[in-house]
Design a protein with these regions (language model features):
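Catalytic Walker B motif of ABC-type/P-loop ATPase nucleotide-binding domains
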Residues: 173-177
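ABC ATPase NBD Q-loop/coupling interface
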Residues: 64-84, 122-123
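Conserved ABC ATPase "signature" region
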Residues: 119-144, 192
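Conserved ABC nucleotide-binding domain
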Residues: 74-76, 135-151, 156
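Helix-to-loop junction immediately C-terminal to a conserved catalytic motif
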Residues: 55
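The feature captures the beta-strand-to-loop junction immediately N-terminal to the Walker
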Residues: 40-42
Length: 250
């Protein structure tokens, strides 16, 4: 495995145990700046725990978790410090402020120390509004700027939450099952959206939808029992007999 010198994210021999269950078992993973990686694997493979470790929610029992060419040891930081460092996480279920407009949701993300009731009184600077307009374009919500977030479709809520993360200008974006529950059209748009985001940011996508992973066209890592089982293109990974046996089936 490559060293941490050039890697944006470097995990080496990371292990996590919960009540005797080893959720991560000497997991090693390297992400280069500007890369998008798809993470697949059966339930219980360690995908969520891996993201918990990266974001500071869970402390590993052992192993290295380094960021920014090895300059930052993420195991020494809490969740808020890691978020400020530039690591954003999108959970599977969208969490947006449903009683507020799309615009106000993005305003809140740009100034996350403000209270929701203040956002309507906040006057955008030209720079802030330009940034919001840019994000609206990326997440396909430019025509819904004044719409309440609660009135959006499930897919649009997912896009809005991704937009809220983009407003915080992350270097690394972790996205958990972004197309679960989406229509086919929304799924196709999400693949395009993530590829656009990947032009400027490193992205990790945890996903079970293999058609969606194929649309992404990126390197794939399959986890099993807390370790990397297989890695390569989707064709390489999906033809691996070990992956077929434990995950894809015949």
């Amino acid at each position: 495995m490559k060293g941490p010198t050039t890697a944006l994210l470097y995990l080496d021999a990371v292990s996590v145990t919960f009540d005797g269950f080893r959720a991560l078992n000497a997991l090693s993973l390297v992400l280069e700046p500007g890369e998008m990686r798809a993470i697949i694997g059966p339930n219980g493979a360690g995908k969520t725990t891996m993201m918990d470790v990266i974001t500071g929610k869970t402390r590993p029992d052992q192993g290295d978790v380094l960021f920014a060419s090895g300059e930052v040891d993420l195991t020494t930081l809490d969740e808020a410090e890691i978020a400020r460092l530039g690591i954003g996480r999108k959970f599977q279920k969208p969490t947006v402020f449903e009683a507020h407009s799309v615009l106000d949701n993005l305003r809140l993300a740009l100034a996350c120390d403000r209270r929701a009731w203040k956002s309507a009184l906040w006057r955008d600077s030209a720079e802030e509004r330009a940034r919001i307009d840019e994000i609206l374009g990326i997440v396909r919500l430019g025509d819904h700027v004044d719409r309440l977030a609660g009135g959006l479709s499930h897919g649009q809520k997912q896009w809005l939450e991704i937009g809220m993360l983009l407003a915080q200008d992350p270097k690394l974006l972790l996205v958990d099952e972004p197309v679960a529950g989406m229509t086919d059209a929304e799924t196709a748009q999400t693949a395009i959206l993530l590829r656009e985001i990947n032009r400027e940011r490193t992205v990790v996508v945890v996903e079970h939808d293999m058609d969606f992973v194929r649309d992404l066209g990126v390197r794939v890592t399959c986890l099993h029992e807390g370790s990397v089982l297989s890695e390569g293109s989707l064709d390489q990974v999906s033809s691996d007999e070990r992956v077929i046996e434990v995950y894809l089936g015949r």
